[in-house]
């Protein structure tokens, strides 16, 4: 057995995806399945397709090429704004491309015509999260400069940068922009892409107005979580991905470091609480593999204390007997899963049940 290893339950992932698709479809909303956290893993992509998802959302061309090589067909949506240095390849392999610049929109359209492709453009609008997109107050004026380009939709993002939560008011800003583009500038806006996993909470509570007809979902499907709204989604499974790490040391030590203190190896100042002598287990897993802040122990009585590049320190005082060679399991947040999937040192194992 090789550790650390990431256990992947495709059955639970498929069920999560199916539930999200069914809930959204009842309200006339299409789900774009986001594959980027798995680096475009073909088995994950196939699982989304089995659940009824059509468009696969990706941020990196390499991941799309990986899926295509494995026989996964489009449509694919480019979720990150394109780099000019990759634009030719993007137009060649993506069916939908998000942009936030008129010149880029025109270049996408020009390349699409040259390649005899029908690449559809989604123009991104910033309604407050402060990541990509034209500022909403200037959106109509800027997008109007793109007449002639194949702009079929507008979209926005929530939570990923500013932590902004989707509300009815935010959705209505998009719909107002759609109406002005169509009424005053002759656009036909077929798609209003109303955000990502944080928007599911609004969907559940009837806060998404009619006219928002697409969501781009990754975190909810892969983990059954919504970090922006700080919740576990109770109607979805969290038994989708688990990471296992092997114990390499068990010792009783003070709970506060001894001596003059500076910052840790990552420049962080760590606050330690004096709890006396505690039993600590070190696992062969570190920040090079995961985000230690996003590790959630499966076992009761286990607490993640801190981590360095290759070591994670656990408090196991309340767990019971622990010895070198034992294995602990953890659930993960999105940031933690992203690092685990990206790390070449984490073995990926597909399990029917975990």
Curated annotation (Swiss-Prot):
Optimum pH is 9.0-10.0. The modification N6-(pyridoxal phosphate)lysine is found at residue 36. Optimum temperature is 85-95 degrees Celsius. It holds the Pfam family Ala_racemase_N. It comes from the Bacteria. Its EC number is 5.1.1.5, 5.1.1.12. Pathway: Cell wall biogenesis; peptidoglycan biosynthesis. One of its GO terms (molecular function) is lysine racemase activity. One of its GO terms (biological process) is regulation of cell shape. Gene3D superfamilies: Alanine racemase. Its cofactor is pyridoxal 5'-phosphate. Catalyzes the interconversion of D-lysine and L-lysine. Has also high activity toward ornithine, and weaker activity toward alanine. Contributes to production of D-lysine and D-alanine for use as peptidoglycan components. Homodimer. This is Lysine racemase.
């Amino acid at each position: 057995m090789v550790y650390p290893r990431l256990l992947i339950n495709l059955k639970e992932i498929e069920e999560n995806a199916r539930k999200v698709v069914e809930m959204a479809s009842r309200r006339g909303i299409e789900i774009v399945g986001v594959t980027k956290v798995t680096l475009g893993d073909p088995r994950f992509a196939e699982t989304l397709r089995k659940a009824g998802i059509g468009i696969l959302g990706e941020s990196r061309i390499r991941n799309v090429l990986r899926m295509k090589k494995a026989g996964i067909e489009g449509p694919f949506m480019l979720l990150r704004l394109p780099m000019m240095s990759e634009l030719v390849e993007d137009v060649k392999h993506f069916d939908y491309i998000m942009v936030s610049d008129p010149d880029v929109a025109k270049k996408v359209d020009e390349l699409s015509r040259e390649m005899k492709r029908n690449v559809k453009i989604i123009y991104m609008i910033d309604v407050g999260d402060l990541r990509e997109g034209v500022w909403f107050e200037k959106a109509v004026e800027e997008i109007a400069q793109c007449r002639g380009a194949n702009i079929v939709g507008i979209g926005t993002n929530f939570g990923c940068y500013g932590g902004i939560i989707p509300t009815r008011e935010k959705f209505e800003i998009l719909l107002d922009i759609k109406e002005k583009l169509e009424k005053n500038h002759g656009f036909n806006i077929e798609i209003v892409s109303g955000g990502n996993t944080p928007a599911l909470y609004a969907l559940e509570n009837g806060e998404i107005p009619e006219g928002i007809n697409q969501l781009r979902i990754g975190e909810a499907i892969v983990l059954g979580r919504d970090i922006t709204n700080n919740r576990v989604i109770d109607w979805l499974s969290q038994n989708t991905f688990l990471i296992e790490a092997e114990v390499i040391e068990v010792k009783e030590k003070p709970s506060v470091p001894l001596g003059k203190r500076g910052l840790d190896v990552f420049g962080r100042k760590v606050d330690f609480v004096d709890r006396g002598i505690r039993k600590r287990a070190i696992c062969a897993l570190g920040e090079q593999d995961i985000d230690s802040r996003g590790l959630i122990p499966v076992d009761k009585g286990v607490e993640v204390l801190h981590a360095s590049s290759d070591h994670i320190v656990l408090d196991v005082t309340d767990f019971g007997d622990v010895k070198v060679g034992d294995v602990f399991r953890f659930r993960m947040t999105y940031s933690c899963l992203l690092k685990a999937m990206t790390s070449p040192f984490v073995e990926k194992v597909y399990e029917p049940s975990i």
